Swiss-Prot record:
It is an enzyme of class 2 (transferase). One of its GO terms (biological process) is protein ubiquitination. It comes from Cryptococcus neoformans var. neoformans serotype D (strain B-3501A) (Filobasidiella neoformans). The lineage of its organism: Eukaryota, Fungi, Dikarya, Basidiomycota, Agaricomycotina. It catalyses: S-ubiquitinyl-[E2 ubiquitin-conjugating enzyme]-L-cysteine + [acceptor protein]-L-lysine = [E2 ubiquitin-conjugating enzyme]-L-cysteine + N(6)-ubiquitinyl-[acceptor protein]-L-lysine. InterPro entries: E3_ubiquit_lig_Bre1, Znf_C3HC4_RING-type, Znf_RING, Znf_RING/FYVE/PHD, Znf_RING_CS. Pathway: Protein modification; protein ubiquitination. SUPFAM superfamilies: RING/U-box. GO terms for molecular function: ubiquitin protein ligase activity; zinc ion binding. This is E3 ubiquitin-protein ligase BRE1.
Amino acid sequence: MNADLKRVRENTLDDSPSPSAKRRLNSNASSPIQPSDDEGMAEWMKIVEVKRKEAIYRQMLEYRRISEHETKRANDLEAQRRVLEASFHAVELCWTQIVAAVRDLAGAENLQLKEEEVLEPLLDPSTPVPELEKALRSRLPTTRQLVTRFVDLVAHNATRPASEADLQARCLKLEAEASALRSNSKLLESEISALKGSRDEAQRDLQRIRKALDRERMEHGKAQEEWKEERTRGGQATPNLRANGSGHSTPNGKVEADKKFYSGAGPSMAGVLQDTSELEQLAASRLKQLEQLRFEQTQLQQEVDRLKILANHPSETALRESPFFQVYLHQLSTSINRAESLQTRFTATESKLDQLRDSNGEFREAVLAEARGQTETLRAQMAKKDSDIARLRGQRDELNSEIMERRAKEVEKCKYTEQIENLANSRQERISFLTSEVRRLKGKLAAAHSSDGYLSFLKESGIDGDYVKDLEAKVVTSQDQINALTSQLERVSSDTAAAKSETEVRTELESAKRLLARYERILGPNPEAAEDVRYLSQQLEKKEKERASLEMKLEEAEAATNALYSEVEGLSKLWEALDQTVKSKVLELRDGEQKITRLATEKAKADNKYFAAMRAKEAVDMEAKAAQRSVEKQLRLLERAQEVETSLRSQITANEKGLTALKNNALDLQNQLATVVAEKTQLELRLQQSQNALVEAQQIMHQRVAEAIAEKEARAKLQDEADGQMKIIKKLKERQDAVAAASQTGMSDHEWAITQERDKLLKLLKCSCCEQNFKQQVIVKCMHTFCKQCLEQRIASRQRKCPACGLAFAKEDIQTLYWQ
């Protein structure tokens, strides 16, 4: 911020010294002549311009903070949108699970649902609201059908319906809960509105404090720059400058440095211009060389990246040409030959096994029958056990989900309570700060009215007491004391009139003593004082009162400053606490998003596994049912037709031979499957290698992009510096051309400087809009001056904004500018 502020001031006051330098030069000026109104107006206008640009800069800082706040709000809305999208997907998954559960409970044939229409994903968060309503209407009949089916199931399975009294009791209970929730919601809405008001007030206070801090920072930076400038100019003496009323030798406050630059410009101007052109040519050639070297560096960097990627992830051709690959290929061929020999031995063993199987048919039949019986028994036991396990798992999952839900609710309640406590503490601290501010303002008011008694009352009782009631109590106490003393005097003296006169005499005596003491303190013990001494005493008495009032104001100002320091410190602590709260909330939001993403991924994986297991289970069930039906048919055929046993045995033998052929085919398919799996593994390895190479290339690309961005920023900074230097060079060239033209016309350096100063003063006197007429009128709001024609033209065209600062003005805000 200090660099930006420095740039603003340098652009505003390019030729004039700083305000501290002006004050120093004004204080060191030896001539008693006052500066002219024109110079004072110009300096005042420059100072006003600096203040205006500083105010614009502070407003820009405020806009930047507002922009950051709006960006944060946009990010929060985006996070809410993602949460809603996840909710949409959760609704889709829940709908799918409900349909599957109803289908399993009621049966797909009895339910008569079209799964293509029911399970079609109609809810999409990207679709507009009317289309979502249409999708919900399309699912409404299906939902009603599901609910009707559930009601039918409950009606068939229920023992007896609930009584009317129970229903009425439940209805009353639900209505009471609804009314309680409604009142609670209204209470929460009122609390939310109050919290919103306090939040807006806190935001306004924070905005005002930020503006005050920006102003203080800018003032601190300005004071630091002035201190540095005073240190740099502290050793310079100005005894030989001509004083013109402002302490400078020239009207705009410049010294004779420019004249020294142009003192020898006559004979050496051609050489300076030639050196400048040679330097420009040298800079252009260096720029071309730099661009060529940068292009070569880029090419070499790209070549290095390519070679690095090839070194980390070589190609297949290079791998095949390597000797290690040849050695591994030889080992692989040896292993393949060994596997083929083992396969031949396995085939021979299989043929022998088939022969033994054919010869041992009867034994196999008996064993198979016994195994079938045991299998059926074990299958029934396993089915019963699976149903028990599924029931227990369901109960366990329900209990776990309920426990997790309750834990999450308890954690949320604890967090909410802690946040409410933090807000209450911050509100209490804010109330204490406001109390301190009220006490400070009351003290300031008392100091402004020179009320010492009210200040002492504030120090003793604070802001909660009533000063008027305290004074009334003191008056009543004094009156009681006076009455007591009067009654005492009346008791002592029998004469009431004499006692009363004595009381009056004593009162007058005490007042005369106090007045005499005041006069003796001012005039001394001599009662014969002259008129001038009396006048002096009166003046001294006035000064004494002023001194007491100023001391009172100084004391109150110190107390107010200390209170302000404590308030600023407390507000800074509150701001730090709020900043930490915001950071913790951001981190919690990020952790929550990561957790939601991870849970969604795990849920998708679990769903895929579940559906795969269900499909496998259905396939196994279908196969088991088909096998059971075939076994029953075969048993019935065996019981009914024993006479065809021989033919059946022959058929069994034929079937066994076919089974052997199928087994051989299955072995061939297994070999093919192994080959395909090996190819798949090889392709996966290639894909992984390609992905690793791609990841490394992307990392290199990101690194190069970051380097390019850094180089671009550095280049932009250098370009800004070069633009600034070009402006300086252009200005120097213009001065060189002007000096050369002046030397050709035979004009002396002093005359040329006077001409330049005259042109500059004429430019200051002329209107900045048309640059033709002189400044005649001033806008009192911003104190910018223009000619009468330009302002009248703007008033006539209703463009009533200042051309310099854009501030709106009226016709009454224009005053005539008088030059004296």
